[in-house]
Regions:
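Short, compositionally biased P/S/T/A/G/V-rich stretches that sit at domain boundaries
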Residues: 1-13
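Contiguous beta-strand segments within globular domains
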Residues: 10-25
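A glycine-anchored, Pro-Gly-centered beta-turn/N-cap motif
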Residues: 14, 38, 77-79
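Short, well-structured beta-strand segments within conserved domains
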Residues: 16-20, 70-72, 79-87
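Short amphipathic, basic-aromatic surface patches that mediate peripheral association
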Residues: 21-32, 93
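Short coil-to-beta strand junction motifs in C2/discoidin
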Residues: 32-40, 100
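Short acidic/polar inter-strand loop motif in beta-rich domains
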Residues: 49-51, 88-99
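Short beta-strand elements
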Residues: 96-109
Length: 109
């Protein structure tokens, strides 16, 4: 999985539209148990990854896309923000071999 837009290092204005990409894995809604599938979780400004053997907590820094969404628009405060995608299975638990994007940094002006 990866963040298609915005690009790493990009300067943007709020609201920010994010688009997610995937290959070799299917995007499915939460609750849909299917091999090689899951749904996106967006990690915002996390210094450390959450526990990888438990359901990901929903918070302002861990946004769940349980309907299988691949795009969203977010209001972000001005400043530098880190963004990373982490795929969770039907129960919101990361896969045994985590499926995640590179962390990118954007600046909201």
């Amino acid at each position: 999985v990866w963040i298609k837009s915005p690009q790493d290092g990009q300067r943007v204005s709020s609201p920010v539209t994010l688009s997610f990409g995937n290959s070799n894995v299917a995007i499915s809604p939460a609750g849909t148990e299917r091999a090689n599938s899951g749904h996106h979780h967006l990690l915002i400004n996390l210094q450390e990854l959450p526990a990888m053997d438990m359901p990901l907590p929903a918070s302002a820094q861990v946004i769940h896309f349980g309907k299988g969404q691949t795009e969203t628009t977010l209001e972000l405060e001005p400043g530098v923000h880190s963004l990373q995608l982490l795929l969770g299975n039907h129960l919101h638990v990361p896969h045994a071999r985590p499926v995640m994007s590179e962390k990118i940094t954007i600046t909201v002006e």
